[in-house]
Swiss-Prot record:
IMP binds at D13, E14, G15, K16, N38, A39, G40, H41, T128, R142, Q223, T238, R302. SUPFAM superfamilies: P-loop containing nucleoside triphosphate hydrolases. This is Adenylosuccinate synthetase. It comes from Cyanothece sp. (strain PCC 7425 / ATCC 29141). The gene is purA. GO terms for cellular component: cytoplasm. The lineage of its organism: Bacteria, Bacillati, Cyanobacteriota, Cyanophyceae, Gomontiellales.
Length: 445
């Protein structure tokens, strides 16, 4: 038995969907523990591309129980669209469960999200505009509407009338926008309630029962460590806790129930939206990474900013999450490069900094690089470490050494089979993967 958390070790978009999909084969239960439709993961199976925002990747395995936990915020309209999309592809959703205590995103949340971002002007934070922040704000203010409220028509009507009237004041007075008609929203969401009702349960009991029965549980995080509300690059963060500790709160399990934490990181770095990005490449090389990596957001379609691998934020993710191992994705994107740089430290006001700094200092960081040779040949066909070009293997060893954590999985493309499993990241021995000892890495002057 193993209870495993999968988290993003960068700014999100690391390829967690594919890794979770691979690991779901060994899982009895997959739990999404935070975030909402601001996250998106793409899974490719037999040439079919699935873009999901709320439903866990494990839905592709009919014997795997998939849970949307209480720490998430759910947009019912989007969730139903995903259910319909899966049905068209012949994927059963009978194994999907929705926590009755998860909060619900309303139309006014989306409108307020976009209006507030517009009002920030030059201080905008790069929100997706999907209403996530305002939904979590209502949760914190204890005025939010939960799934269990959605399931009771009388309660929903009472709460929505009050909520809509309250939000209309904000929309009209602060943002100069027209008010909502409570009756229209009530009618719309009562329809959603009937569609989702068969999936709604007390998920904390389901998860507790799975733990008691020693079933394999996979906790799936959205976004990434550097977008964490408390530990990320504030204020350019999300409104929840994607870090491993968030799994306990968002799923309703004790910390002693977690056996292993797996971090997912690209072989380079990307970021969407605003905020400092020390290793960002704004030249043709950045465009090359964007084109080869198809770096456009699953949720917003926005172009991602691209840069070299940043081991400083990587080590920070290892520390904050207690990572046991790493999955490195999109190694194949680097196949055409003559040389590859890795940020090993920062220079801040003339001083070397090897630890992740506070937000004010982070905005002044200049990267300090180590340069490694590229391999200039395709890797997407490789299925073992022995198949990799020596320079590619050296690059992975260097990342593992500088991050001080072993690499368990290497992804070389979007398809399931384009993967090297170094060792079973769920059942394999902890910290016994690549590399076992420091590895000398040739460098280009």
């Amino acid at each position: 038995m193993a209870n495993v958390v999968v988290i993003g070790a960068q700014w999100g978009d690391e390829g967690k969907g594919k890794i979770t999909d691979l690991l779901s084969k060994s899982a009895d239960v997959v739990v999404r523990y935070q975030g909402g439709v601001n996250a998106g993961h793409t899974v490719v199976v037999n040439g079919q591309t699935l873009k999901l925002h709320l439903i866990p990747s494990g839905i592709l395995y009919p014997d795997t129980e998939c849970i949307i936990g209480s720490g998430t915020v759910i947009d019912p309209e989007v969730l139903i669209q995903e259910l319909d999309q899966l049905k068209l592809l012949g994927v059963s959703t009978a194994n999907l469960l929705i926590s009755e205590t998860a909060h619900v995103t309303m139309p006014y949340h989306r409108l307020i999200d976009r209006a507030a971002e517009e009002l920030r002007g030059s201080h905008r934070i790069g929100t997706t505009g999907r209403g996530i922040g305002p939904t979590y704000a209502d949760k914190s203010e204890r005025t939010g509407i939960r799934i269990l409220d959605l399931m009771d028509a009388t309660t929903l009507q009472e709460q929505l009338r009050w909520a809509v009237n309250h939000k209309n004041v904000l929309l009209e007075k602060m943002y100069g926008l027209p008010p909502y008609d409570p009756a229209e929203i009530i009618a719309e969401y009562l329809t959603y309630a009937e569609r989702l009702r068969p999936h709604v349960v007390d998920c904390s009991l389901k998860i507790s029962d799975a733990v008691r029965r020693r079933r394999n549980i996979l906790f799936e995080g959205a976004q990434g460590t550097l977008l964490d509300l408390d530990h990320g690059t504030y204020p350019y963060v999300t409104s929840s806790n994607p870090v491993a500790g968030g799994a306990c709160v968002g799923a309703g399990v004790g910390p002693t129930m977690i056996d292993r934490v797996i971090g997912v990181a690209k072989a380079y770095t990307t970021r969407v939206g605003e905020g400092p990005f020390p290793t960002e490449l704004t030249d043709q090389l950045g465009e090359l990474l964007c084109d080869r990596g198809a770096e456009f957001g699953t949720t917003t379609g926005r172009k991602r900013r691209c840069g070299w691998f940043d081991a400083v934020i990587g080590r920070y993710a290892v520390r904050i999450n207690g990572l046991d191992c790493l999955a490195i994705t999109k190694l194949d994107v680097l196949d055409q490069l003559d040389e590859i740089k890795v940020c090993v430290a920062y220079e801040i006001d003339g001083e070397r900094c090897e630890d992740f700094p506070n937000a004010r200092r982070f905005a002044r960081c200049q990267p300090i690089y180590e340069t490694l040779p590229g391999w200039k040949q395709p890797t997407d066909h490789c299925r073992s470490l022995e198949d990799l070009p020596p320079q590619a293997l050296n690059y992975l060893k260097f990342l593992a050494e500088i991050m001080e954590v072993p690499i368990a999985i290497v992804s070389l493309g979007a398809e399931r089979h384009q993967t090297i499993i170094v060792e079973d990241p769920i059942h394999g021995p902890k910290r016994a993967l690549l590399p076992a000892s420091p590895v000398p890495v040739p460098k280009i002057a």
